């Protein structure tokens, strides 16, 4: 009988991937990036370990959503003070902080525990095409072609 092998922390090879978010649909991009952050694309995937890779997302300001979500989708945050609820539409947040839209979408697809917080630290999102991670020589991650159609 074969036994399930659990990879040791030292044996996990981490790669860097570059994702161009230009003209990508937000949810479709987020699911694929979350899967790579978790390491689900590797044969050594273990649910309780961080086996994933680093992901750099560029052109976050050019992400798109389908339908009328640009005007209807709302992002809420609360300061913790009475009356401290702030509500902002997708379009307003994209003009102000486009990185936050991508980060929030991907973070919601990661585990909601300490492992998810550790995985989220491996995500780097930038507004434009420039990023400071060229020393890591990130490979371009090809997303599903259906994600960029329409």
Swiss-Prot record:
InterPro entries: Ribosomal_uL13, Ribosomal_uL13_bac-type, Ribosomal_uL13_CS, Ribosomal_uL13_sf. It comes from Prochlorococcus marinus (strain MIT 9313). GO terms for biological process: negative regulation of translation; translation. GO terms for molecular function: mRNA binding; structural constituent of ribosome. This protein is one of the early assembly proteins of the 50S ribosomal subunit, although it is not seen to bind rRNA by itself. It is important during the early stages of 50S assembly. PANTHER family: LARGE RIBOSOMAL SUBUNIT PROTEIN UL13M (PTHR11545:SF2), RIBOSOMAL PROTEIN L13 (PTHR11545). Belongs to the universal ribosomal protein uL13 family. One of its GO terms (cellular component) is cytosolic large ribosomal subunit. Residues 129-150 are annotated as: Disordered. Part of the 50S ribosomal subunit. Residues 136-150 have a biased composition (Polar residues). It holds the Pfam family Ribosomal_L13. PROSITE patterns: RIBOSOMAL_L13. HAMAP family: Ribosomal_uL13 (MF_01366). Keywords: Ribonucleoprotein, Ribosomal protein. This is Large ribosomal subunit protein uL13.
């Amino acid at each position: 009988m074969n036994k399930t092998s659990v990879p040791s922390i030292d044996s996990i090879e981490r790669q860097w991937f570059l994702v161009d978010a230009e003209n990508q649909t937000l949810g479709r991009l987020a699911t694929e990036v979350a899967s790579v952050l978790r390491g689900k694309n590797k044969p050594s995937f273990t649910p309780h370990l961080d086996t994933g890779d680093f992901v750099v997302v560029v052109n976050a300001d050019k992400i798109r959503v389908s339908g009328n979500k640009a005007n209807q989708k709302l992002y809420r945050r609360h300061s913790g003070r009475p009356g401290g609820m702030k509500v902002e539409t997708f379009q307003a947040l994209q003009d102000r902080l486009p990185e936050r839209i991508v980060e929030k979408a991907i973070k919601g697809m990661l585990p909601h525990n300490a492992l998810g917080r550790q995985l989220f630290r491996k995500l780097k999102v930038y507004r434009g095409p420039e990023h400071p991670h060229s020393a890591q020589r990130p490979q371009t991650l090809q997303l599903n072609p259906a994600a960029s159609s329409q």
